[in-house]
């Protein structure tokens, strides 16, 4: 069956979006704890609304961190520093409700999970079960240099650029909240050929005109990010299409940790298991196994074994080995998917403790992932973005 030209859309949000504020607070708390106690168990959820931050969750640690201080520093770093923005780091109320991890959950995970993954025997790694059941997906494709789908790649770059021009005062009238969306046209062979539509909504000072925002964003944001050859006379631009976006951030919408899971991953281009990332330490397979699945998929594509690869992992609580591993190359594989699954089993340790060891996940590295995507990042060195297994996979596949 001949494929038709089609459109695909992905969105991103800035670090000042209410849900992303929550992700960054949760991961800032996680990082602060991991910096002092690498073996801490953290499941930290945040919600924000007008003038209020609530931090709740289960944390088991030997250290102390000043959660209200971390919350205020995070909000200040994002740029909510004045009451007229509708949310202010100094004056917002911060409530906390923290318990320890359930003993029933800990029983299935504990065994030998100390800071000695480097010296652990295979039997000890095998003894450490997953912290929950669940399924996780990882994806990679050769549409971009970072092996990510083009729509989400461009949406993230636009969102990041919105923040840059706000913080460096290029467009000093911008305020922290904002969203971007990119629609890409694909040809009959499934290759991206042009950008069809760009949508940007950004919070702004009440006195700036829509015409000024429209002109400035096209010049300083879109032109700076989207390659000229991808845009043409038919490309459509919707800049603040409601005409006004003054009330934003937590004053405009309540926010919650883990509510931007598609923004965090592949923009809807690949499937998602449903688990969120932020605020969770690496014993939570929602996070660590999703990172591992991306690592596997990226190395498969980097090795030239497929143009696209979607990897699914699934776990049972308290059990170390994945209950299933599957690879779907969407018809682009150079070897069979059975061969790819065998290569994955032979070259990647996908047990929870094995993932932590393989990707070195007991470090305070998570706040930097909490805005602009966890995958395809070129601005920070993330272990799951490395392609150090590609040569081995290619050789073992006989290519």
Swiss-Prot record:
Gene Ontology CC terms: cytoplasm
GO terms (BP aspect): one-carbon metabolic process; S-adenosylmethionine biosynthetic process
Binding positions (Mg(2+)): 19
Annotated S-S bridges: none
Upper taxonomic lineage: Bacteria, Bacillati, Bacillota, Bacilli, Bacillales
Keywords: ATP-binding, Cytoplasm, Magnesium, Metal-binding, Nucleotide-binding, One-carbon metabolism, Potassium, Transferase
Pfam (any one): S-AdoMet_synt_C
UniProt name for this protein: S-adenosylmethionine synthase
Cofactor annotation comment: Binds 2 divalent ions per subunit. Binds 1 potassium ion per subunit.
Cofactor(s) required, per the database record: Mg(2+); K(+)
Binding site for K(+): 45
Native source species: Bacillus mycoides (strain KBAB4)
Subcellular compartments: Cytoplasm
Residues binding ATP: 17, 177-179, 244-245, 253, 259-260, 276, 280
Family: Belongs to the AdoMet synthase family.
Chain intervals for the UniProt region annotation (Flexible loop): 101-111
Pathway: Amino-acid biosynthesis; S-adenosyl-L-methionine biosynthesis; S-adenosyl-L-methionine from L-methionine: step 1/1
HAMAP family: S_AdoMet_synth1
Binding site for L-methionine: 58, 101, 253, 284
GO MF terms, alphabetically ordered: ATP binding; magnesium ion binding; methionine adenosyltransferase activity
């Amino acid at each position: 069956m001949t494929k038709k030209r089609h459109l695909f859309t992905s969105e991103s949000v800035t670090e000042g979006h209410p849900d992303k504020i929550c992700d960054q607070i949760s991961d800032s708390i996680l990082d602060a704890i991991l910096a002092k106690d690498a073996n801490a168990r953290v499941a930290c959820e945040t919600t924000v609304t007008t003038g209020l931050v609530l931090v709740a969750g289960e944390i088991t640690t030997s250290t102390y961190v000043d959660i209200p201080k971390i919350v205020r520093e995070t909000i200040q770093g994002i740029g909510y520093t004045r009451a007229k923005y509708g949310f202010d780091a100094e004056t917002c109320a911060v409530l906390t409700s923290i318990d320890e991890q359930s003993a029933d959950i800990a029983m299935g995970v504990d065994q030998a999970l100390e800071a000695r993954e480097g010296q652990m025997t295979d039997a000890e790694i095998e003894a450490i079960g997953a912290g929950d059941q669940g399924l996780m997906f990882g994806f990679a494709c050769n549409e971009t240099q970072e092996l990510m789908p083009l729509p989400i790649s461009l949406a993230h770059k636009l969102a990041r650029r919105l923040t840059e021009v706000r913080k460096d005062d290029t467009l000093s009238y911008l305020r922290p909240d904002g969203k971007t969306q990119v629609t890409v046209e694909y040809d009959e062979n499934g290759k991206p050929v042009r950008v069809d539509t760009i949508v940007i909504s950004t919070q702004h000072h009440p006195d700036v005109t829509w015409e000024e925002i429209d002109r400035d964003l096209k010049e300083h944001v879109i032109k700076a990010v989207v390659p000229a050859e991808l845009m043409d006379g038919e490309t459509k631009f919707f800049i603040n299409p409601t005409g006004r976006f003054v009330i934003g951030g937590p004053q405009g919408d309540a926010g919650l940790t883990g509510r931007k899971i598609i923004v965090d991953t592949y923009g809807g281009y690949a499937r998602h298991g449903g688990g969120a990332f932020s605020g969770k330490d690496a014993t939570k397979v929602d996070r660590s196994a999703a990172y591992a699945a991306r690592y596997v998929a990226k190395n498969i594509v980097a090795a030239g074994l497929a143009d696209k690869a979607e990897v699914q992992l699934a776990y049972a609580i308290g059990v170390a080995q994945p209950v299933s591993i599957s690879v779907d190359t969407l018809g682009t594989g150079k070897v069979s998917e059975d061969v790819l699954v065998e290569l994955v089993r032979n070259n990647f340790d996908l047990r929870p403790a094995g993932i932590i060891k393989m990707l070195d996940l007991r470090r305070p590295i998570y706040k930097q992932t909490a805005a602009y995507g966890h995958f395809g990042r070129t601005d920070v060195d993330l272990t799951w973005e490395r392609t150090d297994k590609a040569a081995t996979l290619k050789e073992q596949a006989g290519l």
